[in-house]
Every structure is written in C-alpha cells, then in structure tokens.
Amino acid sequence: MRRPGVQNVDPTRAIALAAVAAIVGTQLIYFGLPFGLWLHGLVLGGLNAVMAVGMALIYRANRVVNFAQAELGTAPTAFAAAFILFWGWPYLLGFGAGLIMSVVAGVVVEFALIRRFRHSPRLVVTVATLGITQLLVAVGILIPRWWGRNLASERIAPPVGWKLTVGQVILNANHLIAFVASMMMMAGVAWFLARNRYGVAIRASAERGDRAAMLGIPVGRLNTMVWAIAAAMSYVALFLRSGIIGVPLGYAAGLPTLLQALAALVIARLERLPTVAAAAIALGLLESGVRFNSDTPAAAYPIMALVMFVVLLVQRTSSSRRDTDTASTWRGADEVRPLALSDRRNARVRLLQLTVITVGMVIVIGAPFVLRVDYIIKTSAIFAFAIIGLSLVVLTGWAGQISLGQMAIVGIGAAVSATCTSRWHVDLTLGLLIGGCAGGVVAFAVGVPALRLRGLYLAVTTFALGLATEQWLLSDRFFGWFPSGETRFERPPLFGRIRVDTPVRYYLYSLTVLALAFAATRGIRRSRTGRVIIAVRENERAAQSYSIPAVRAKLTAFVVSGVLAGVGGALYAHLNQSFSVTSYSTGESFSVFTSAVIGGLGSLGGALLGAAYLRGVRWFIPSQEWQLLSSGAGVLLVLLILPGGLGSLWITVRDVLVRLVVNRPPVADPDVPSPVPVEPAA
C-alpha cells in the first residue's frame, strides 16, 4: 500500500537508470579518457543515440525491432558522400540531397515491403527487416562503384574551419555540428511524440492499431511517417559520423553501430526514449574508453555483450498487457502436414514412397563416385549447413524464436571440436559430439537471461554474442586455445581404424551424420518434448495453464538447437581441415538464417533446401554484394509469396502425386460454398 505523499518507484526504470549509471561509472573508473577524447566519445555517443531513438520510434509504432535501422541511412549517405567528394557539391547541398533520399527510402520501404506484412505476426516483420538489411547493405556497397571510386573510410570535410584543441585532441566543426544536430533531433522527436497530434496518434495506434483504425486514425499513413522519420534519423547519424570517422559501408561498419543501439534498447526495455538516449550515449563513452585503453577496438564488443546479459538477468519479468503484446512467434500454419492415415495405408502410395526413397538413396550415395572432387567437397559442405539449418528449424520453426548469432555457436562448436581432434587426438565422432555439447552449453548460457522475458530479446542477445565471438572469443589476437587459420590439421580415423581422409569417404561420413541428426530431430518433434515446444509457441498462456513451464520449453529448444549447430560446425571445420573465424561471422549468421527461411522453417527437409540455396548462390555468384542481393530478395519473396518456403513446394507436389495415385479428385476450397442441388419443378 502506498503511503500518502510518497510515489511508487518503477523498478524497471530504476534498473535501467542504474545500468546507465553503472556504465558511466565503469568507463570513468576502469577506462579513463583524456577530456578531449571524452568529448569525442560524447559526440559519437550522441549520434548512436539518434540511431537508437529511431529504432525505438519504430518499435513504439509497430512493436517491431528494425534490424535495418543502420542500413536505412547507408545508401543515402553513400550518395551524399559521393556528391560531395566525387562531384564537388557544397556540403549543405549534398547533405540536403541525401536527406531527401533517406525520407524517400523510408517511405518506399514501408509502403512497398513493411505494409505487405501488416497482418503478419511481428516476428515475421522482424525477419523481413533482415532481408531489407541485406538489400540495403548490397546497395550501399554498389553505389561508389558507379563512380569507379572507393568511399571506404573517406571523411567529409566540414563546411566551416572551426577547430578546438583540447589537450592533444583536435575537435573540428564536424564534432560541433554532430553534437548540436543529435541533441536537437532527439529533442524534436520527444516533442513530436508528446505534443504533436500526429505523435499522439502514433502512440495510440501502437497500443491498439485495430481500435485506432476504427476511430478514424490513419494507421497506415502514420506508419509511413514513422519509417520516414526513422530513415532520416539513420541518415543524419551516419552522415555526421562520416565527417568524424569515415563513410560507413558494408556489415563491418553498420553492425557495431547497430549493436550499441540494440544494447541501449535492451537497457530501456525497448521503448523509453530518454533512457534509450542516455544508455546509447553512455555506451558510446564506454566504447571510446575501451578503444583508448586497449590495443584493439574489438575488446569493446564482449563488454557491451556482457552489459546486455547482466541487464537482462536483473530485469524483472512482467505479465502486463504491453509486455504480452510484444510476444510474437513464427507462423505455424505452414508446417508440413502428414499424409492422411488412409493414404499411408494405400498400397500404391506406399509403393510410391518406397520408390522415391530408393531413387533418392541411390542418387545421394552414388553421387561421390561420379562427381568431380570439387563438387564432392561442395556437397559435403551442404550436408554440414543442412545440420545448421536443422538447428534453426528447431529454434524458429518449432519454438518461434530468432537467433542472429547462430554462426557464433557453430564457430564455438567447430573450434572446440577441432582443438580436441588436432591437439588431443580425440576420435572424430567423439570430437563432433564434444562440439555439439559446447554449442549446447553456449546456448544455455545465452538463453537463461534472454528467454526469461517476452519478446525479441533472444535475437538481440545472440546478435551481441555473434559480434563478441567474432571479434574477441574466436580471435587469435586474444586467444590461442584453438587452431589458427594457417594451421591445417588431419582428420583422425574413426574409432582408430576407419580412415576418412579422402573426399569420398568424408562425403559418406557427412551424409551419415546428417541422417542421424535428421532422425534425432524428427524423433524429438514426435516426442512429448516436441509437442510441448509447439504448444508454447502456439499459445504460451494456454500452455502454462496446463502446468507447462514455458521458459524451460523455449530453453530446451535453444539447447537442442545449439547442439545441432555445434555438430554442424564441427563437421564443417573437419571438412576444411582448418579453422577460420571469418567463416562464422555475424554476417554469415544473417545469411544462414535468411537461407533457412527461404528453405522453409516448417519442415526438416527445408533445412536441406536452404543449405543448398545458400551454398549454390555462392558457387554461381562469387561477388559478396550480389550474394546479399539474392539472399535479401529471396527471403522477402518467400515471406510475401511462399510463406512455407521452398519446402512447401515439395509438400504441394507430394499431395498432387498422392491424389493422382489414389485417383482422388482435388479437394474443394473450404472458403467457397458448394452449390445446393435444386429439385426440378414438377
């Protein structure tokens, strides 16, 4: 009971403010900076805050975490920088042209893509932003090539010659413009949401879009406005950042900025704008302090990931309507349907199944004896990535959760397994199992803080894990517990007797491992564990009413996913007979996830189709930007046209063949009423 004159303190807000204070205190105590560099970090933190507030604005309007926020401003920034640096345009003219382009880009993205998913689960819209991210990254890389130049790390000169020397640090007009513009833009957004009638309408439509539409609020137009504002904020942050540290291009530039913005969102529980801005500025100062006090800037990534994990551990769970609304899962309508019992018992259908299985086995087993060596190796890689795809089917297709750092778990499993077999001479099969266990342990450690809360926290934390693993944990600059990229190791014989040192033998071994992983995953799906995971995905509250622990079910799915990912990574590392961290980057996690969506997350066979798509694109399209275009466009087309992925095409073909075999007419559309027979008049 509240005492008179005493206000209740929101524990969530108190935790967020304490986290911001702890970040600032950590920077001041352990990562001290000269005052000039502290001002430099404050300016960069302000620009990161603009990016984070733009993400929070979209989240407040759509309840969607926009992973394309950093890339919305990439293409306009590239154009503006090219206009100024290559064509000699004045600073203000180039900035204005880029600003107009960013607004147009935000409108086009919302109107042409996001609006098409307005009736889809929010998780599906979040996946769509991943496809948009890949498209925009590719466009940002291609733009400078139209001029035949390279924009990487080019700095835009300030429009005036103002300078301020603080110690040994020189701050120019770019710093002053960036600081003033970032503060004004965040203040403008706060005023817009609190005082402007459109801002109030945006807040109302975010809470209950259907009710807002019934009251005459133009929800679609407001969403377009929000995306245009967010794109403009992204552009302003990246353009002003270009004058300080260089033009950002590609994943390497956009992902660290996105990590800071996401960390700020996690601290603020995704929507408190003042806390988002304060956390982003504090993280910018912390990053500057880490960069100054360490030999490499990569040390900042594990620290930011640790901050996110600690904040998630101390945050309280909530069952309020707002937090319940943020919970969303992958669509379950496109799961593979088993054949009807009468069809399975039909002799001709059973003969057809036996024929298809026999022909498939003959082709797969006989392929290495007729293919060239390079094709045998490439097909073995497909088998390894198919196991990784199975891990995403379990996590996203069954549990309805997203992992954007799956390749980090794959890499850890690969590193542990390669270390066991190359240094400790462990049996290859045992090494694969150890790699799988390592992946499961990592998944458990990450899932405990992330899966306690409803929403997309697992996607955010695994994204942080991916960057921290790529830049720090699996970097030979910091650790040497795993084989370095230059070290080639031999595959040990199976059980000390059966050699798998040739491409054909390793192909057959990889095929066997894939078959066992497929059988194990299928068995889990048919068990009570699989049914519980599906039940929690479909209706978490209803499952909890039957005494099903929802968090434990989701954590189980993530651990199973981690084990499969670790086994796939171990298999891939021994295929290459070397370990290179570049094969397990965060960009690779994006590609693997989108390929799994293209293959189909509703079926185990979709994992194989997604792996074939991913590796096939890289065989025929060696250029990275065109690979990103094909992957981004592919996932958007699948979400729009074929929600079940390529795997659903096989199910359609299966149903047609079965119908022809049993000589049954097509099933009528249940939405179309059947004609009522009318008796002729006497």
What are these regions (language model features)?
Residues 4-5, 32-33, 39-40, 44-47, ...:
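Transmembrane alpha-helices and adjacent helix-loop boundaries
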Residues 115-119, 201-214, 264, 291, ...:
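Short amphipathic alpha-helical coupling elements at transmembrane boundaries
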Residues 56-65, 235-252, 263-266, 566-581:
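Non-cytoplasmic
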